[in-house]
Amino acid sequence: MEEYQLYLELDRYRQQDFLYPLVFHEYIYGLAYSHDLNRSIFVENIGYDKKYSLLIVKRLITRMYRQNHLIISAKDSNKNRFLRYNKNFYSQIISEGFAIVVEILFSLQLSGSLEEAEIIKSYKNLRSIHSIFPFFEDKVTYLNYISDIRVPYPINLEILVQILRYWVKDAPLFHLLRLFLYDYCNWNSIIIPKKSIFLFSKNNPRFFFFLYNFYLCEFESIFFFLRTKSSHLRLKSFRVFFERIFFYAKKGHLVEVFLKDFFSTLTFFKDPFIHYVRYQGKSILASKNLPILMNKWKYFFIHLWQCYFDVWSQPRTIHINQLSEYSFHFLGYFLKVGLKHSVVRGQMLQNGFLIKILIKKLDIIVPIIPIIRLLAKSKFCNVLGNPLSKPSWADLSDFEIIARFLRICRNLSHYYNGSSKKKSLYRIKYILRLSCIKTLACKHKSSVRAFLKRLGSEELLEEFFTEEEEILSLIFPRTSSTLRRLHRNRIWYLDILFSNDNDIINHD
């Protein structure tokens, strides 16, 4: 990122609050399409001389502003295959370059804020999504109430553009942004159809994820700011803080804010035992205090979405549940708080007695049914969990077939080894093991029993169960009691950066 910043002379444009010229740099599109910085996507694909690449980008932007999006002239269309595509193709190309520009800008701002908050030193240790579960184990068992929140969408994109303008003072850049969004969405409607959002995210994945993450970041920045300053905001209207122009100016003078008659008012409160966790669009809010405080946070979220982002959200979509009676899904796991009975023997003088103790314990369980459905979708088994062969892999060598199945088992073990109960994980391994045997038998045109008999033993397939034990034995002492204890306990791997079920069972 520092190399790109130096190469694109980003500091000079940031000082002038003018990023629009960066869209005309051909190196931006080299980054967007994973090309080398010294080569141009336009030069490589079309055969243009290097000096014309800037002209092509300018032509594309000019054509986006015109009513006739198809062909500038017959002369141009005959010479340039590149100019015969439709307007969505032009928007897609330039939006990728636009996304690179804003990604670099906001990543630099994020790094600066982390350094100021002295978080940058521990940031690398918190990159793994599995670091959330040790946090749950330490905190959740002491809490009483939990709320499972879905961040509403789609957002009014015009509101999102207006919010972005308070971060970057560049009017031409946002005129271009509006033009991208206008190509995919009905700009005049308050609620953007989900079909348009799906089309936009499919054609412009980098740009879409930037806008979606910025929406979440803006929502959480207001939430965290008001959460930390809640003791100073008692009996104040929170509608006044939604005007972003005055929002940051009043951060140092919150006591001086006047009580005004706005559309909605919320009494702020102090809740030191509240915890908030989010991954993608799903959030978990947990608290130790009375449910009335959780109810206040619930209506705070609803008013925030409706008044600031113009996103409709109903109170019944957010449920407040008692943690001891509620279970929830998060990051592919099934979590619930259970009671563990423990008996302690005590003795006073000559009298002995037993003390029964109830201890809260967080159970993190592998959801066996969704994983079996995922395996059934990939044709490893049927919907009942009965293993099937993979005829499409029969043309591969035996070594490649076994390697693919082992890779899938390794991914599943790597991700779900933090489960409290390993029986479900072993069942999934068993399904994959039999699916591998059936695939090999199908390749050699024999039955499973005849194939195993001809093989003589199952040493070739023992890796399905011994590989994990060999890895653990390299880390911990080679004692049977230690390995048995490790198989019962949870093991979290802090090198998992994202969660995607399709990638877990992907053989590539």
Swiss-Prot record:
HAMAP family named among the record's database cross-references: MatK (MF_01390)
Main localization category: plastid
A single GO molecular function term of this UniProt record: RNA binding
Stated family: Belongs to the intron maturase 2 family. MatK subfamily.
PANTHER family: MATURASE K
Functional description taken from the UniProt entry: Usually encoded in the trnK tRNA gene intron. Probably assists in splicing its own and other chloroplast group II introns.
Transmembrane segments: none
Database matches in Pfam families: Intron_maturas2, MatK_N
Keyword annotations: Chloroplast, mRNA processing, Plastid, RNA-binding, tRNA processing
Lineage top rank: taxon: Eukaryota
Cellular component aspect of the GO annotation: chloroplast
Protein name: Maturase K
Name of the gene encoding the protein in the UniProt record: matK
Cellular localisation: Plastid, Chloroplast
BP-aspect Gene Ontology terms: mRNA processing; RNA splicing; tRNA processing
